[in-house]
C-alpha cells in the first residue's frame, strides 16, 4: 500500500524495473551477489536474474515466469486480487507477516500480471559474523557537511540487532528480524577502546549502548524451530523466552568500569514491561545510565488502542513511572521520563484522543512533539489503515482519516495557539464544547 498515492501498487521491484532487489540488513545476500557477479564475464552478466534465482541468495527478491522449482513456497493471492479486494489484502498480509516471524521462513511468491515475484527469506548473521562488521575500516566521518545526529552517533555503540516487541506500527522486525543477535562484551569493549575513545571530542561518555530496544540484549528463544507469534512479550510473556535482564546489567557494569569511561547512557529507549521484571536493573538504570531524560513509549492510554498497537497495558507504564520516580528520589536524582504518544493510530477514536488529552493535562505533561500515525510499508497498522480490518482477527477497525487526523493530533497539544480552532471543532463534534477552556488553559 502506497500512502502517498492512496493505492495498492505492484512490488517495488516491478516498478523499479531492476533485475533483483535486496532488502533488510542483507550483508550475506549482498556478498553472495557480489561474489557471483565478480565470477562472470560481461556477456554473462546479462543473465544475472536467473543466476540469482538459482542460488537463492537470502534477503533477495526476483521476478520470474516459472515457479515450479519452489515446491515448499508460500504462494499469496495475486497482486490483482489484493488490489481489488481489501479482505484478500488483509488475509495475504497475515500470511506474509506470520511467515516472516519464523526462524526458518519459506520462500514467498506473489503472482503479478502474468509473472511472479519471488522473495527469498532473510538469514540472520551469527554472532561472529555480526561482530566482524565492527572490525571493518569505516571512516566514521561524514562525507561532507554537518549531520545533526552524528554528534550522538559517533560516541554510541550497537549491542545487538532484532526486536521481538511486535509493535503494530513498527517495521524494525521486518528488517532486522524477531530474534536477537548480540555482540560479545569483548567485541563491544574493543570498539569503544579502539574506535570511539580515540575520536576527537570524546569526553568519556558513551551516549548510547543499545539496539532497537536496549534491554533486549542477550534475550534468546529456547525453541529451536521458533514460532509465528508477532511478539514474544505481548499480550503475555512467552514461556520459551529467556526473560532475564542480567546480560544487560553485566554489559553496562563492565562498560562503565572501563578506564577512561565516565558515564554509559541508554539513549535508544527500553521496554518498561521487561525492565519491571528486575529490581536490580531498575536500580542500576536510574543510578547510572540515564542522561537526565529517558525515552519511553507508552503510545496511548486506552486499552482498545493499545491492543491494536501491540503495546503493554497502560497500568504497566504507570507502574514503571512510579518506580522510576521513587528510585530517583532515593538516589537524589532529578531525571525525567520523555513519553512518546501516537495520534490517529488505527482503532483510535476522537473519544480516545480526548481521554489521552485529559490524562496529559492532569499530569502536567506538555508534549513538544506528537507523531500523527503515518502508514509505512510492511506493518500491521498500515494494513489496518488501508483495509479497515485487523488482519489477525478479521474484525473491522476504526481508521481516523481526513480532518479527524488533525483533530486527534491537536487534542494532544491543546496548549498551542495554532491548535485552538481544531480543538474547539473536535470538542464540538463530540458534544463537549464546554471543556474547551479547561483543556486549553
Residue ranges of predicted features:
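Catalytic cores of alpha/beta
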Residues: 280-281, 345-361
Amino acid at each position: 500500500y502506497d500512502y502517498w498515492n492512496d493505492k495498492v501498487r505492484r512490488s517495488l521491484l516491478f516498478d523499479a524495473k531492476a533485475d533483483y532487489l535486496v532488502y533488510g540488513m542483507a550483508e550475506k545476500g549482498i556478498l553472495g551477489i557480489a561474489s557471483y557477479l565478480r565470477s562472470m564475464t560481461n556477456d554473462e552478466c546479462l543473465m544475472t536474474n536467473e543466476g540469482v534465482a538459482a542460488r537463492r541468495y537470502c534477503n533477495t527478491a526476483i521476478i520470474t515466469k516459472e515457479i515450479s522449482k519452489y515446491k515448499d513456497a508460500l504462494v499469496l493471492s495475486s497482486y490483482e486480487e489484493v488490489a481489488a479486494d481489501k479482505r484478500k489484502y488483509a488475509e495475504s498480509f497475515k500470511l506474509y507477516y506470520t511467515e516472516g516471524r519464523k526462524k526458518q521462513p519459506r520462500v514467498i511468491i506473489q503472482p503479478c500480471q502474468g509473472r511472479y515475484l519471488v522473495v527469498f527469506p532473510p538469514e540472520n548473521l551469527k554472532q561472529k559474523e555480526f561482530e566482524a562488521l565492527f572490525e571493518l575500516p569505516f571512516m566514521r566521518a561524514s562525507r561532507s557537511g554537518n549531520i545533526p545526529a552524528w554528534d550522538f552517533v559517533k560516541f554510541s555503540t550497537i549491542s545487538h540487532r532484532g526486536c521481538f516487541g511486535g509493535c503494530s506500527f513498527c517495521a524494525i522486525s521486518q528488517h532486522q528480524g524477531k530474534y536477537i543477535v548480540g555482540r560479545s562484551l569483548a567485541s563491544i569493549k574493543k570498539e569503544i577502546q579502539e574506535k570511539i575513545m580515540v575520536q576527537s571530542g570524546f569526553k568519556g561518555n558513551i551516549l548510547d549502548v543499545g539496539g532497537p530496544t536496549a534491554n533486549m540484549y542477550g534475550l534468546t528463544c529456547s525453541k529451536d524451530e521458533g514460532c509465528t507469534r508477532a511478539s514474544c512479550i505481548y499480550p503475555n510473556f512467552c514461556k520459551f523466552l529467556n526473560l532475564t535482564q542480567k546480560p544487560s546489567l553485566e554489559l553496562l557494569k563492565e562498560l562503565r568500569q572501563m578506564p577512561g569511561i565516565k558515564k554509559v547512557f541508554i539513549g535508544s529507549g527500553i521496554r518498561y514491561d521487561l525492565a519491571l521484571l528486575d529490581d536490580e536493573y531498575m536500580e542500576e538504570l536510574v543510578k547510572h545510565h540515564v542522561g537526565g531524560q529517558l525515552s519511553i513509549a507508552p503510545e496511548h492510554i486506552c486499552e482498545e488502542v493499545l491492543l491494536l498497537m501491540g503495546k503493554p497495558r497502560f497500568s504497566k507504564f504507570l507502574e514503571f513511572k512510579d518506580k522510576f520516580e521513587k528510585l530517583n528520589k532515593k538516589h537524589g536524582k532529578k531525571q525525567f521520563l520523555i513519553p512518546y504518544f501516537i495520534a490517529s493510530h488505527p482503532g483510535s477514536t476522537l473519544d480516545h484522543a480526548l481521554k489521552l488529552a485529559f490524562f496529559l493535562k492532569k499530569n502536567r505533561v506538555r508534549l513538544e512533539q506528537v507523531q500523527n500515525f503515518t502508514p509505512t510499508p510492511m506493518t500491521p497498522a498500515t494494513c489496518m489503515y488501508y483495509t479497515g480490518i485487523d488482519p489477525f482477527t478479521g474484525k473491522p477497525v476504526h481508521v481516523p482519516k481526513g480532518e479527524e487526523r488533525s483533530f486527534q493530533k491537536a487534542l494532544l497539544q491543546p496548549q498551542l495557539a495554532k491548535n485552538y480552532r481544531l480543538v474547539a471543532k473536535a470538542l464540538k463534534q463530540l458534544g463537549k464544547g464546554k471543556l474547551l477552556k479547561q483543556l486549553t488553559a
